[in-house]
């Protein structure tokens, strides 16, 4: 039988003596744990980390002790080192009570917002993005390009920055960085990636380093950079925004699909203007391979000029640089027209010695129609019934343009100032465009002011502006509707 062993008898004094050190130890440990887990207050004050929304590239903020470096691994010192040093500065009490400390919180604008990067030929690349406008206006940021090959080698290149938005930028301005190497950095076709260093100022010590483009092994094809190209003509549309009329988009698309022919392609950029109704009228053309719609709605996070128009047209220019012989830039309330029986092929053949040409507009009224009871206006297309042209001359009007993209480094909304080659402006007898301003977002009936039939033969003053009758576009409507029906099988009889 197992015997119970009684515990030794201890006095109360001894128990208390042993318990007190244990309790003190536990309290001390608890206090240490609490202090350990407190958030680093001053570290938060000076943290340079920023949220990364919709960024897919790897970014490293680096600090250089010298501008001479040999490899990607050797020339980075984490910015956290500087952050820690700054934390110590804020933690210490200034010895001089009159010395003020400036503590930054957050970031007002990014140093660089990458939209796209594209190979521009065997030895050149273009990186397109946004950058803080104050930095470029008041500072001297600069860039450096590097190609890191999959075979382990690397090569650096000169970088030239272009600011193509004519000073219209707001918080952000558009930046196109051209990287030109002495030879093809992927000549062995093993693949690699293009790295961009974006410097904050003249000093080479602080910059952001990120990947802009990657080429897989075997993907490089030099034949893509010389004719024949995939298309004869490419349309690069600006940012589509607002409450766009699906009817106006359908008319515009049918007309220009006919005008440019089967070897053409249209690129639209949806900044909020491609509603389900607009998407529905574009969908048949998308399925036919004639249209691409790119979703750029996230551009609204970056305050640039007019829905970042300059950013969008530059991205389109470089993305499709070798896709077509000619790239056209104009809006969806504008219709390209060839007067005097000209053909597009003959006109562009004549203009081919120029890198770009600009196009003069015929400004049309958005409200004036003929009061004709025989016309069923609600069923007619916009350019079928808006037939009055502003007849003022010798005033400056905005022009649109077409460009041989292979010879352009950057572009604008109305023309490019960064090209190799000549620009032709005297084109009005060969090609023009009809501009139906203030119609693209009108969903109700366009004919809101009626003029008598006699207005066809005289000048009409409306809102103190002279208008004359011009039915050149109306004469094409039957042809365009038949073309649309043939291409898409669309019943246009009930079109409104």
Swiss-Prot record:
Keywords: Cell wall biogenesis/degradation, Glycosyltransferase, Golgi apparatus, Membrane, Transferase, Transmembrane, Transmembrane helix. It is an enzyme of class 2 (transferase). It comes from the Eukaryota. The chain crosses the membrane at residues 22-42. It is found in: Golgi apparatus membrane. Disruption phenotype: No visible phenotype under normal growth conditions, but mutant plants have reduced content of beta-1,4-galactan in leaf cell wall. The keyword Metal-binding does not apply. Its EC number is 2.4.1.-. It is a single-pass membrane protein. GO terms for biological process: cell wall biogenesis; cell wall organization; pectin biosynthetic process. It holds the Pfam family Glyco_transf_92. Residues 232-464 form the GT92 domain. Expressed in root vasculature, mature leaves, trichomes, flowers, siliques and seeds. The keyword Glycosyltransferase applies. GO terms for molecular function: beta-N-acetylglucosaminylglycopeptide beta-1,4-galactosyltransferase activity. GO terms for cellular component: Golgi apparatus; Golgi membrane. Belongs to the glycosyltransferase 92 family. Involved in the biosynthesis of beta-1,4-galactan. Can transfer galactose residues from UDP-galactose to beta-1,4-galactopentaose in vitro. Forms specifically beta-1,4-galactosyl linkages and can add successive beta-1,4-galactosyl residues to the acceptor. Beta-1,4-galactans are abundant polysaccharides in plant cell walls and are found as side-chain of rhamnogalacturonan I, which is a major component of pectin. Plants over-expressing GALS1 have a strong increase in beta-1,4-galactan content in leaf cell wall. This is Galactan beta-1,4-galactosyltransferase GALS1. It comes from Arabidopsis thaliana (Mouse-ear cress).
């Amino acid at each position: 039988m197992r015997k119970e062993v009684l515990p030794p008898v201890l006095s109360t004094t001894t128990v208390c003596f042993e318990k007190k050190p244990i309790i003190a130890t536990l309290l001390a440990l608890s206090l240490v744990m609490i202090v350990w887990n407190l958030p680093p207050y001053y570290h938060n004050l000076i943290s340079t980390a920023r949220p990364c929304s919709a960024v897919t590239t790897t970014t490293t903020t680096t600090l250089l002790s010298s501008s001479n470096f040999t490899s990607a691994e050797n020339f980075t010192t984490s910015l956290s080192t500087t952050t820690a040093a700054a934390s110590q500065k804020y933690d210490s009490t200034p010895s001089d009570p009159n010395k003020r400390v400036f503590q930054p919180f957050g970031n007002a604008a990014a140093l660089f917002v990458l939209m796209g990067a594209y190979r521009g030929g065997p030895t050149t690349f273009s990186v397109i993005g946004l950058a803080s406008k104050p930095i470029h206006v008041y500072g001297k940021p600069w860039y450096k390009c590097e190609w890191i090959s999959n075979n382990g080698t690397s090569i650096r290149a000169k970088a030239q920055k272009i600011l193509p938005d004519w000073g219209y930028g707001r918080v952000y301005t558009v930046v196109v960085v051209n990287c030109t190497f002495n030879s093809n950095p992927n000549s062995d076709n093993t693949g690699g990636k293009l790295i961009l260093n974006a410097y904050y100022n003249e000093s080479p010590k602080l910059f952001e380093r990120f990947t802009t483009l990657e080429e897989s092994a075997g993907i490089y094809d030099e034949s893509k950079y010389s004719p024949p190209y995939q298309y004869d003509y490419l349309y690069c549309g600006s940012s589509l925004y607002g409450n766009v009329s699906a009817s106006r988009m359908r008319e515009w698309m049918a007309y220009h699909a006919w005008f440019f022919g089967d070897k053409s392609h249209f690129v639209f950029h949806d900044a909020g203007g491609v509603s389900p109704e607009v998407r529905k009228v574009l969908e048949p053309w998308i399925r036919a391979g004639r249209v691409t719609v790119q979703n750029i709605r996230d551009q609204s996070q970056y305050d640039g000029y007019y829905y970042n128009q300059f950013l969008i047209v530059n991205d389109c220019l470089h993305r499709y640089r070798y896709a077509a012989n000619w790239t056209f830039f104009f809006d969806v309330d504008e219709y390209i027209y060839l007067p005097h029986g000209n053909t597009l092929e003959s006109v562009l053949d004549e203009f081919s010695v120029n890198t770009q040409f600009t196009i003069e507009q015929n400004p049309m009224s958005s409200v004036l129609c003929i009061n004709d009871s025989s016309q069923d206006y609600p069923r007619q297309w916009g350019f079928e019934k808006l037939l009055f042209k502003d007849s003022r001359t010798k005033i400056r009007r905005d022009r649109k343009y077409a460009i041989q993209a292979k010879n352009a480094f950057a572009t604008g909304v109305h023309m490019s100032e960064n090209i190799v080659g000549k620009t032709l402006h005297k084109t009005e007898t060969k090609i023009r465009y009809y501009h139906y301003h203030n119609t693209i977002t009108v969903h109700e009936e366009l004919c809101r002011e009626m003029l008598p039939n006699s207005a066809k033969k005289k000048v009409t003053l409306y809102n103190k502006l002279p208008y004359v009758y011009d039915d050149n576009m109306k004469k094409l409507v039957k042809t365009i509707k038949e073309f649309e029906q043939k291409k898409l099988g669309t019943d246009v009889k009930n079109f409104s």
